Amino acid sequence: VRQKLAILYTLIAFIFLMTRGETSAADSTVAKSSAAEKRAVPVALDITNNGTQLLVSCRNGTVKRVQIDSREVIETVNVSQQLSAAKLHIAQRAYAVLDTENNFLVRLEVVDGKLKQMAKIAVPAKPVDLVWSQDGKRCLVASNWARQITAIQWNGNSSAKSAATVELPFAPGKLILLPDQRNVAVADAFGNGMAVFDWQELKLKRIAKIDGHNISDLAISFDKKTLLLTHQVLYYDKGTTRPAVHWGGVLANVVEGIDLESLLSDGNNSLTGNNSPTGNKEIFGNKERLTVPGKVYFLGIPDEAAGDPAGLVETSDERRIVVYSGVNQVAISDRGVNFYNRIGVGKRPTKIALSANEERAYVCNSFSDSISVLQVNPAKVLATIPLTGQTVEPTASERGEELFFNSKLAQDGWFSCHSCHTNGHTNHQLNDNLGDDSFGAPKRVPSLLGVSKTAPWTWRGTSNSLHQQIAKSVELTMRGKPVDKLQQDDIVAYLKTLLPPMSVHAARSFHSRRATIDPVAVRKGRSIFRKSGCVDCHSLPNYTSADSYDVGLKDELGNTKFNPPSLLGVSQRDNLFHDGRAGSLKEVLKEFRHGQDRELSDEQIEALIQFLMRI
């Protein structure tokens, strides 16, 4: 009865809710989320040169201009179906946004008081971040699934061309122009990768990695000597017991400071203690990938954790402002970063922008469709600016998405589902949990992209119910309170929206007719896949099957039978097998001779890899 009353009161609250925005409060309505009226979901914001307006880019494909003094949206422009990132170049008065649905870089400018599209250029899929050069004549775009960065040269404000496209050993996420104005730091979107791109030479200068994953933001310290990162560290050898989670022993939320001089060196720096069981040296091209030494600042304490740190800025008087995305808070430190004051904001705060005088900060509340206006010192919320004129009732999948990114599901708020399954994919790390009903044999965190069609679940294939697996993960991995049936339904609804990742080949050739894979080799590889029996375990259409198999691998507890993971999007995985012991498809087939009754020749292995890289 209480639950029914709670639902009734919630519905009544929705009906009478009035918000301020582009329409008057009297016109405010409740609407079902649809293609015509979706939640805005702000993903990026910038402050204009005179400090009077905010430019806010939203996942629903719109860019909004917000008047700061009146705290209202004064213009909304439809750019595409979905945007992922945006950056303002103040001197050029140009706003570059990324159309992640159609894979374009779009240039906007204010003309006669209105935002106007000036140019757009195709980029590899899936563009997720960009930076401008200091002079505003170039942009660098990170394309996630293509595992590439693309240097774009602007020809005035109405056209552009691609100057160079560079491949990476990881899926790129965040970018930042370094103080020398020549080099750009490139962060891994999921795992522990870092790179430095030399904009003058149009090539990679450095390949490195950190002890961590989920690099959510990059910033430069006030003295311009340190690159700051918000990220997480998953301790693969710590079982997810209640005490371990409570004391922060399973997953840590941190700000890491990397000395820029070390980052820009030739890579001869000393190695730090590496949390990964797969070693700390890798080779990409002719570059050795070393762990970059950094100073780690831990966020959160038992009973009051700081799950999923995101946006980050540092002021000239040495105050650090960090967005605690998973617990809906912003933390503002004292001078010298000795302690933080936390203030509550909207749901899933992500991006942050600082006013020129550093007295105000503006924060995107992604799931509240709003901007929080903060006073830096003393720390407090001054106002909340709504981005939509009506309250849109979330769908089941949208409620599930909110739960997926909510660190409060875990004990003390240490981590969310997203913390390990980054944006529904994987952080490429190992975790020792009770998914397989035992501790002592850490397993690779699987991607959840396409997961609704790959039953059974867990590495040993012991779960046939996605609802039960979700409930078990929250209670025994996250050590949170039990999730009810409605919450399980909502999370399942969200997981059903997650499609398998695009292959690297498809992402790189999205706008190009040039084949990145030999079609003859692909046909030959498909034939080998079928004739060699790979298809027996990795059956079409999802390239998996319901059984578990002994393929000559054994975990630490003696288990030898494992359920085969789907091979859809396998090119987007940094490590393979249940424990990540293989670092590439070539290693799987050549060194481990996986699934081969008869040894394949080098030519056959290459053809099979070409096929697998395409699916």
Per-region residue spans from a language model:
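Hydrophobic core register within WD40 beta-propeller blades
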Residues: 45, 86-88, 130, 175, ...
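Periplasmic c-type cytochrome electron-transfer domains
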Residues: 178, 192, 202, 216-244, ...
